[in-house]
């Protein structure tokens, strides 16, 4: 017997009769559908009539009624079950709109009643108020089918209380499109590869009426390949081969849906597993090695689900190919299919995903030809390179991939799992592991998926100069220059609530003054000394108006007047004022930066602070870190926008106890403002020191790149289990893999940058020399074009490569 896919025929629509796969379909629209549901008695009589009607039909005829329950009329549904269940050949099922409410243990308002009389139930989509009749047996002649359907019309018209009307060709089209989920990508600035490409009624009609297996969009022809089986070991090679060896295979669509508990139970109980993956009616048609591989995959899935280390998903993978010529399209699809079928026994077939299968799958009682696979979460993540957009909704997630000449597309990093307490994150990325490419990509993702939110980066390695230029951000390369002068003291209007100072701001300024006055002879301060500093701060702000930016000189004047009767306190004040002199003396270079009535205005929503130039002055670097931290904290109170704060190369910051306490406090308190904190370090040890436990415990998202051997032993300290550690140690590849742990889940993503991404994200010495003019220029109209022109020329680039950065 031939495989199922070879038996699929092109649909023919003739007036109100539709034939498909040797079946004849006639569709009806229910008229006056609110009449019989107005009362329990009318509903009871109607279902009794249906019961009698179905029992009088030919056994080969499949009848499907789909009704929408109105006003939560529970007695009607109960009576329907009572009467329809008397005949064992009739099955009654209740579904909600999305066919998922039962899985969640709740019921939606809109519920459908599905009644089917047949020997074999078929998977079905449900829509409002419609009727369809199908034959399962192969007809001897079309005339016979018409005759039987005409007799059916007579019986149907004799039913009391309710009327059915034959659905015309246009009505059938409209009905079938009610459930198609063909929305464009959401919350991204990218467009599909054809501006006019949308699977709407007119495209489908044109393709079906002309018996074509592709969609014609303008001057282009689009065909589709579907994966019959998703191999576990395909990983990123599938994407790589698809896009780099065959650029004419322009787009691939991966739809993902979390498997229901029933599907998981079926997999764990080992029922019908082989049959699910055996895609032909004749087992001999399937390659023996492939069968063995599938069996191993299933056993692996069962073990992972039993351990609870994986989640099960249902996925469907399509590849769309396009060409200007019809014959060329056939060649492209043939070449692509042969290429993909060589990857770990992957099996692709040419299908009609673009029109026919999607259309016909909407008919009640008809089998769904969209091929779905069971796949574990980690294997699914290996399938996805990082340049991808999110499409759809949390209930219907989709990923749409583009090839390496298309615009850069973001990766969704805001995981929708309900068990995440906060979206704070941490990254462990040793030198040479691919950190610069990954973090640059995350930053671009943040800006493109939420352009109205704030993104603030504090760095010490000049890793983000180019991305800041391209995304029109503000870049502050802090040095001993007047333009980077920042007073440690905020304006009074920013930190006072009425007549009282904000308590958090008072603590911040006190900690900063403590940092300014500390030296080898003045390390630990007593509570009394800290209180003296707070009195000096309050006196400072009493002496200035609301819009004045206080400076260190003014603070010294106010601090010297603080009453201190104790001799030790008087000595402390004198020592503190003496230590502040290095910042207030006009001849000191530090006064140029810290003793000026200036503040950096953070008007741009994307800001990068580079403090690497202050590496020779660790105390000054920490002071600037404090000031920048407070500027960023003041933006937290903006209730209309969220904020991503990234601390890169934090090992020096976390070494200083005062600075480390600031980062720790942000991880604990930023969530209530809708802020997300991300710390990046080369070593796990920087996150496991005493007093820093709150960082890994509150970072619900952890990104691990290829680690050095000595760091593996620290993974349990930040919440990794034995299975995860084993994979990170043995299987994670440098400059390619990113192990992502979010909540109790873990996946592996592939770092596969395009040529433009490589040029944009690179941070080596040659790159800095190449783009020196770009860095020094204040305003460049199109910096991305300059970067694109420096890409090593392999093949002529397409114009679309720059579109992804339109904010």
Where in the sequence are the language-model features?
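Extended, folded cores of ATP/NTP-driven motor/assembly subunits in large transport
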Residues: 1-385
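Post-Walker A helix-loop "phosphate-sensing" segment adjacent to the P-loop in P-loop NTPases
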Residues: 445-456, 471
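Walker A (P-loop) phosphate-binding loop of P-loop NTPases
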Residues: 432
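A short helix-turn-beta junction within AAA+ P-loop NTPase domains corresponding to the substrate/partner-engaging
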Residues: 474-476, 692-704
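Hydrophobic positions on the alpha1 helix immediately C-terminal to the Walker A/P-loop
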Residues: 438
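Hydrophobic anchor at the beta1->P-loop junction of P-loop NTPases
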Residues: 427
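Conserved lysine of the Walker
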Residues: 435
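P-loop NTPase motor domains
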Residues: 33, 40-59, 261-262, 345, ...
């Amino acid at each position: 017997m031939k495989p199922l896919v070879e038996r699929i025929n092109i649909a023919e629509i003739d007036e109100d009769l539709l034939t498909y796969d040797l079946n004849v379909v006639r569709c009806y629209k229910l008229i006056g559908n609110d009449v019989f549901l107005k009362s329990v008695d009318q509903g009871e009589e109607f279902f009794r009539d249906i019961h009698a009607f179905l029992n009088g039909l030919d056994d080969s005829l499949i009848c499907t009624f789909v009704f929408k329950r109105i006003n939560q009329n529970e007695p009607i549904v109960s009576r329907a079950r009572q009467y329809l269940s008397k005949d064992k050949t009739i099955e009654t099922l209740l579904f909600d709109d999305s066919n998922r409410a039962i899985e969640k243990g709740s019921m939606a308002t809109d519920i459908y009643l599905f009644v089917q009389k047949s020997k074999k139930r078929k998977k079905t989509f449900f829509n409002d108020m419609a009727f369809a009749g199908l034959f399962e047996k192969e007809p001897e002649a079309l005339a016979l089918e018409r005759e039987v359907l005409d007799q059916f019309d007579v019986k149907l018209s004799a039913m009391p209380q309710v009327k059915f009307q034959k659905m015309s060709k246009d009505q059938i089209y409209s009905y079938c499109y009610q459930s198609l989920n063909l929305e464009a990508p959401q919350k991204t600035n990218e467009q599909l590869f054809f501006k006019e490409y949308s699977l709407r009624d007119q495209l489908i009609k044109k393709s079906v009426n002309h018996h074509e297996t592709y969609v014609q969009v303008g001057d282009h022809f689009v065909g589709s390949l579907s994966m019959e089986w998703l191999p576990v070991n395909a990983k990123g090679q599938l994407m790589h081969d698809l896009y780099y060896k065959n650029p004419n295979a322009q787009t691939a669509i991966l739809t993902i849906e979390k498997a229901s508990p029933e599907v998981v139970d079926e997999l764990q109980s080992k029922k019908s597993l082989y049959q699910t993956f055996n895609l032909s009616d004749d087992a001999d048609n399937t390659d023996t090695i492939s069968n063995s591989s599938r069996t191993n995959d299933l056993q692996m899935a069962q073990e992972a689900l039993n351990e609870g280390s994986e989640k099960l998903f249902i996925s469907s993978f399509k590849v769309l190919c396009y060409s200007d010529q019809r014959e060329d399209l056939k060649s492209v699809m043939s070449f692509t299919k042969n290429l993909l079928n060589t990857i770990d026994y992957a099996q692709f077939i040419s299908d009609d995903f673009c029109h026919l299968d999607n259309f016909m799958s909407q008919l009640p009682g008809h089998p769904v030809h969209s091929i779905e696979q069971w796949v574990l979460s980690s294997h699914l993540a290996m399938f996805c390179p990082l340049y991808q957009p999110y499409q759809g909704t949390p209930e219907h997630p989709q990923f749409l991939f583009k090839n390496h000449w298309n615009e850069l597309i973001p990766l969704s990093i805001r995981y929708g799992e309900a068990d995440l307490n906060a979206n704070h994150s941490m990254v462990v990325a040793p030198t040479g592991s691919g950190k610069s490419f990954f973090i640059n990509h995350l930053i671009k993702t943040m800006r493109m998926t939420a352009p109205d939110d704030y993104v603030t980066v504090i760095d010490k390695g000049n890793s983000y100069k180019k991305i800041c230029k391209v995304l029109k951000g503000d870049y502050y390369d802090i040095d001993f220059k007047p333009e980077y002068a920042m007073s440690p003291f905020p304006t009074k209007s920013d930190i006072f609530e009425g007549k009282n100072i904000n308590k958090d701001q008072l603590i911040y300024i006190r900690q900063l003054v403590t940092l300014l006055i500390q030296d080898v002879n003045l390390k630990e301060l007593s509570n009394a000394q800290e209180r003296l500093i707070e009195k000096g701060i309050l006196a400072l702000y009493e002496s200035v108006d609301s819009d004045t930016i206080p400076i260190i000189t003014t603070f010294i004047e106010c601090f010297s007047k603080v009453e201190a009767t104790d001799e030790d306190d008087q000595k402390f004040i004198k020592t503190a004022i003496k230590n502040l002199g290095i910042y207030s003396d006009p001849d000191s270079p530090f006064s140029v930066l810290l003793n000026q009535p200036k503040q950096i205005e953070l008007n741009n929503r994307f800001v990068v602070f580079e403090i690497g130039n202050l590496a020779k002055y660790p105390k000054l670097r920490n002071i600037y870190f404090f000031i920048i931290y407070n500027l960023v904290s003041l933006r937290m109170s903006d209730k209309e926008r969220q904020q991503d704060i990234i601390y890169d190369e934090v090992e020096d910051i976390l070494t200083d106890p005062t600075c480390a306490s600031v980062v720790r406090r942000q991880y604990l308190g930023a969530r209530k403002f809708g802020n997300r904190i991300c710390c990046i370090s080369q070593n796990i040890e920087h996150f496991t020191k005493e007093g820093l436990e709150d960082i890994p415990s509150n970072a619900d998202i952890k990104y691990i790149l290829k680690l050095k051997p000595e760091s593996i032993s620290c993974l349990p300290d930040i919440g990794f289990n034995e299975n995860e550690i084993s994979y990170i140690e043995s299987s994670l590849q440098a400059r390619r893999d990113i192990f992502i742990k979010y909540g109790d889940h873990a996946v592996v993503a592939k770092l596969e940058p395009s040529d433009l991404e490589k040029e944009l994200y690179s941070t080596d010495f040659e790159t800095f020399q190449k783009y020196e003019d770009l860095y020094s220029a204040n305003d460049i109209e199109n910096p991305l074009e300059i970067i694109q022109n420096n890409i090593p020329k392999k093949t002529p680039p397409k114009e679309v490569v720059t579109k992804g950065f339109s904010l």
